A protein has these predicted regions:
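Start-of-helix register in tetratricopeptide repeats
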Residues: 14, 48, 81-84
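Alpha-helical segment of the N-proximal tetratricopeptide repeat
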Residues: 10-34
Length: 117
């Protein structure tokens, strides 16, 4: 059945993520977000896509979208990227005007970092 077919193959997903990273490296977050939004809709549990999209949205000034994406990505992030994702989440909250929320996330990140060392 056609509805059961994936929207993106693994190779297409990987190619779009690499292209998005290249756009981010070239300071073109809007272009990265354009590539990542449909990918995120198709693969909402793909942490790498969500993290990359959060960075693209934050860099594009879409702080509310970035905060929402980063909040979800932070909870699912593997330990080796959790601190970085927490900082992105806190920055998005700060820029959206939620300073108490940003402080709370920063304190949580610092506490987790301290217990892991």
């Amino acid at each position: 059945m056609i509805a059961d077919l994936p929207l993106f193959t693994v190779q297409e997903r990987d190619a779009l993520v690499v292209l998005a990273y290249l756009h981010l490296e070239q300071s073109r977050p809007g272009e990265a977000a354009v590539l990542l939004r449909p990918l995120h809709r198709a693969l909402p549990d793909d942490g790498e896509v969500e993290r990359c999209l959060a960075v693209a949205e934050l860099s594009s000034g879409r702080v509310e979208s970035a905060a929402k994406l980063a909040a979800h990505a932070y909870t699912l992030a593997p330990s080796h990227v959790r601190t970085a994702m927490g900082l992105i989440y806190a920055r998005a909250l700060w820029l959206s005007g939620d300073e108490p929320g940003a402080r709370e996330v920063l304190l949580k990140v610092l506490a987790q970092k301290a217990t892991s060392e």
